[in-house]
């Protein structure tokens, strides 16, 4: 409805209708043109016609609703999820103030928890927030904004010393996690402009390899926000933008403003190009390391790691690989497994933190090489040399089974980080699982109960102490 909103995130026009249909009660109050109007609904049915209930200088709409617990199995709101989204919106719409009040959390004085979200710097502050734990290569984010054309474009970007790319894109405040034409336009302009500057400066003359788009984006954190009157999304979930005209708009804005920045800031420009050169050299070394891992697998026959206790089943859909901590856990896991379907791969100590390592170092790490070899995956498809190839995946379930302590949690995080950065297709394909080890074994005689929480432990003790003698119940903590 262009008469109501210049741009909107709505796609089908059913947002409030769906909320109404899924609520036991809903009340909508509209403040407009000095008047206040209201309507209430129960189970989606209006209780009365829209009525005027007073006058006010306020502008906006207030929606109050209660989820229908006959439809939802759980209607508990996660504070962190809501807070993260409101923080995001405050960065995307600089200057606005958003208040989040949680009446479930009350302090000693009986006051509920209140958090205010406000950003004067907008996307600049957003990038600083995203990179707060990383070491910056240049002091302040590059900022680009243009609303001259039909598509307003806003971009902030910053280079850091990490080896990964973090690009977040938004269309009308919607997070397009799969990217789309606005991201394609940004990448095209970034690669073209930086390469042109690097060529003119002569810094690439001694480099004996071709520089690719990936090299220009290593260590980059960027936020792209566009406003589009008629957004066209691929699929129902609004995760990928399809408007072809957005690519050109973003390309032009980023190209012009980045070129100006590089010309006016030669010191920072040199630092960025040096980072690109290092990325190209590391990429070449990583390609050789990947090829070496895959060549060794071919030359050594099956090439399976020596510590892998494989399963006898040959159908990958029925096979499961358990990644466990060390040889001792591997021994216990082997005793409890079903040899037909369960394979066990013990990992020695903590694997490499791939977030802080150059790519070629990753493929030289023994534990990571063992995981790649055991899984049977390779790198390189028609989409690119770094894309994970799952055609020979040996297990359709990969279970990370670490201890229930801090070390176990750390090892699990390191493995998940490696999968997320270099084997994302495993996660997206639903192949990665996390085992939930119990914290306690509650035992009396031959009766045993495993417990995952304190509440379960207390309930198990009461259940097993039938005669009231809790001291006769043994508790083993893992």
UniProtKB/Swiss-Prot annotation:
Site entry (Interaction with DNA), positions: 350, 353
Cellular compartment(s): Cytoplasm
Cofactor(s) named in the record: Mg(2+); Mn(2+); Ca(2+)
Domain of life: Bacteria
Keyword Chaperone: no
General function of this protein: A type II topoisomerase that negatively supercoils closed circular double-stranded (ds) DNA in an ATP-dependent manner to modulate DNA topology and maintain chromosomes in an underwound state. Negative supercoiling favors strand separation, and DNA replication, transcription, recombination and repair, all of which involve strand separation. Also able to catalyze the interconversion of other topological isomers of dsDNA rings, including catenanes and knotted rings. Type II topoisomerases break and join 2 DNA strands simultaneously in an ATP-dependent manner.
GO molecular function (one): metal ion binding
A biological process from GO: DNA topological change
UniProt GO cellular component terms: cytoplasm
EC annotation from Swiss-Prot or TrEMBL: 5.6.2.2
Domain named Toprim: residues: 319-438
Main location group: cytoplasm
Protein's UniProt name: DNA gyrase subunit B
């Amino acid at each position: 409805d262009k008469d109501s909103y210049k741009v909107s995130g709505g796609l089908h026009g059913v947002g409030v209708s769906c909320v109404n249909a899924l609520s036991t009660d809903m009340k909508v109050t509209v403040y407009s043109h000095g008047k206040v109007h209201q309507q209430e609904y129960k189970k989606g049915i209006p209780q009365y016609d829209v009525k005027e209930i007073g006058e006010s200088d306020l502008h906006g709409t207030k929606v109050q609703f209660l989820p229908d617990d006959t439809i939802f199995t759980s209607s508990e709101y996660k504070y962190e999820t809501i807070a993260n989204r409101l923080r995001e919106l405050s960065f995307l719409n600089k200057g606005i103030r958003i208040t989040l009040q949680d009446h479930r959390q009350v302090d000693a004085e009986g006051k509920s928890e209140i958090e205010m979200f406000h950003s004067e710097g907008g996307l600049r502050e957003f990038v600083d927030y995203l990179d707060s734990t990383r070491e910056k290569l240049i002091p302040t984010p590059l900022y680009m904004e243009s609303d001259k054309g039909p598509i307003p474009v806003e971009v902030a970007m910053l280079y850091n010393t990490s080896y990964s790319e973090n690009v977040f894109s938004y269309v009308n405040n919607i997070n397009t996690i799969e990217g789309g034409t606005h991201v394609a336009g940004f990448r095209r302009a970034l690669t073209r402009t930086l390469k042109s500057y690097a060529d003119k400066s002569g810094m690439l003359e001694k480099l004996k390899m071709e520089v690719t788009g990936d090299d220009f984006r290593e260590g980059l954190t960027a936020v792209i926000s566009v406003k589009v009157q008629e957004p066209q999304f691929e699929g129902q979930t609004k995760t990928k933008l399809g408007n072809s005209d957005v690519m050109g708009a973003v390309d032009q804005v980023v190209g012009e403003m980045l070129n100006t920045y590089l010309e006016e800031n030669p010191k920072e420009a040199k630092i960025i190009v040096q980072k690109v050169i290092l990325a190209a050299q590391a990429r070449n070394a990583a390609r050789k390391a990947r090829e070496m891992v895959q060549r060794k697998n071919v030359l050594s026959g099956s090439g399976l790691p020596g510590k892998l206790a494989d399963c006898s089943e040959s159908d990958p859909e029925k096979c499961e690989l358990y990644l466990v901590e060390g040889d001792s856990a591997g021994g216990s896991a082997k005793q409890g497994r079903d040899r037909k379907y369960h394979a066990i791969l013990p990992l020695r100590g903590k694997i490499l933190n791939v977030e802080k390592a150059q790519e070629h170092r990753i493929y030289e790490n023994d534990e990571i090489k063992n995981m790649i070899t055991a899984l049977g995956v390779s790198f390189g498809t028609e989409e690119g040399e770094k894309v994970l190839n799952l055609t020979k995946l040996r297990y359709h379930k990969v279970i990370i089974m670490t201890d229930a302590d801090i070390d176990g949690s750390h090892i699990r995080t390191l493995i998940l980080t490696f999968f997320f950065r270099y084997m994302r297709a495993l996660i997206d394909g639903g192949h990665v699982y996390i085992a939930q080890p119990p914290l306690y074994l509650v035992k009396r005689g031959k009766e045993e109960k495993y417990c995952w929480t304190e509440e379960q432990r207390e309930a198990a003790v009461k259940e097993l102490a039938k005669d009231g003698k809790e001291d006769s119940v043994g508790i083993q903590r893992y």
